[in-house]
């Protein structure tokens, strides 16, 4: 087992923005273009923890299946303790595993805002506007060269394809949303109070993906072929003719793989694998529309100028992450949104 640290290296050297305002009388017409979300790239050279979870739990399930098959096989042949898949050369019994993994992601949310502010009095003004958001993201990652014990996993999925057990993710996402914005500003004496509220931005990201995921469905057939081949050799070495050895091997294999315990264990392995795989990359299936809302945002600020050359500002920011819909309603796992003070 190779110890892994899942460390992401982010790169966002510059986040530019462009602002424009035209003031006339009591009116101010304003526009801006900026990156309102994302704004960079991140690379995980050892992949993600969710990828390792798939491999680790698959390894444990594979070892459990190997133990069950060997126990049933030994009892069927009258040789308790017989080992075929639990040897150190195969899956082993410890649940050890190894693999290579990588993940790279990029997110850019481009925002174009337009709005107008009106000065109702020398003390009070208000703003209303809207921001159009275009989201563009890309994710690429893989899990390859998976081994359980000393057995490459592809050998029990499709021994003719070395990449049969590989997981590969390559997905582009894009979507559009709109954000209504309101704000107020009030001044009195040396004090200045302001507030801004940005409503939740509903975005549905459309996936365009070319992904690869292994299938456990072929596991019974491939196990059957391996068992028949190995048992045929065992029976031939005991003096049977090749024809008889193959026939007995086929019958024995059929009896083992249709055993209730083996069938149940194999079904559990498939269900576990499919579930964990969907949790890890189901969000990136081709053609799928994924919820990726930008949370509502409240900003409150207070400024005080004891003298003309000094100003003290304090601010409060609230991001309502709890109610911004995301894939599989992950936001419901949050206790609350994000609070910031400055």
Q: What is the role of each PLM region?
A:
Residues 1-11:
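Surface-exposed strand-loop-strand hairpins of Gram-negative outer-membrane beta-barrel proteins
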Residues 15, 21-342:
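Outer-membrane beta-barrel porins/channels
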């Amino acid at each position: 087992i190779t110890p892994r640290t899942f460390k992401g290296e982010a790169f966002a050297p510059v986040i530019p923005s462009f602002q424009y305002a035209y003031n006339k009388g009591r009116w101010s017409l304003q526009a801006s273009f900026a990156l309102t979300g994302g704004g960079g790239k991140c690379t995980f050279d050892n992949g993600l923890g969710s990828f390792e979870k798939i491999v680790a739990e698959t390894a444990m399930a594979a070892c459990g299946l190997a133990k069950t098959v060997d126990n049933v096989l030994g009892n069927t042949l009258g040789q308790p303790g017989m080992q075929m898949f639990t040897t150190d050369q195969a899956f082993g019994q410890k649940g050890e595993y190894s693999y290579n993994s990588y993940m790279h992601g990029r997110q850019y949310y481009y925002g174009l805002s337009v709005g107008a502010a009106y000065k109702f009095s020398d003390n009070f003004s208000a703003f209303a506007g809207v921001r159009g958001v275009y989201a563009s993201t890309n994710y690429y990652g893989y899990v390859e060269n998976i081994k359980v014990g000393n057995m490459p996993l592809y050998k029990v999925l499709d021994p003719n394809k070395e990449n049969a057990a590989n997981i590969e993710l390559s997905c582009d996402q894009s979507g559009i949303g709109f954000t209504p914005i309101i704000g107020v500003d009030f001044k009195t004496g040396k004090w200045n109070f302001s507030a801004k509220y940005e409503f939740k931005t509903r975005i549905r990201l459309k996936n365009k993906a070319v992904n690869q995921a292994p299938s456990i469905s072929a596991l019974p057939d491939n196990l059957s072929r391996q068992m028949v081949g190995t048992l045929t050799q065992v029976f031939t070495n005991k003096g049977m003719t090749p024809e008889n050895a193959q026939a007995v091997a086929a019958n024995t294999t059929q009896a083992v793989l249709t055993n209730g315990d083996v069938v149940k264990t194999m079904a559990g392995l498939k269900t576990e694998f499919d579930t964990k795989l969907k949790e890890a990359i189901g969000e990136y299936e081709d053609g799928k529309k994924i919820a990726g809302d930008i949370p509502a945002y409240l900003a409150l600020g207070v400024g005080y100028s004891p003298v003309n050359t000094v100003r003290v500002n304090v601010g409060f920011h609230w991001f309502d992450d709890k109610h911004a819909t995301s894939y599989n309603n992950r936001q419901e796992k949050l206790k609350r949104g994000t609070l910031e003070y400055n």
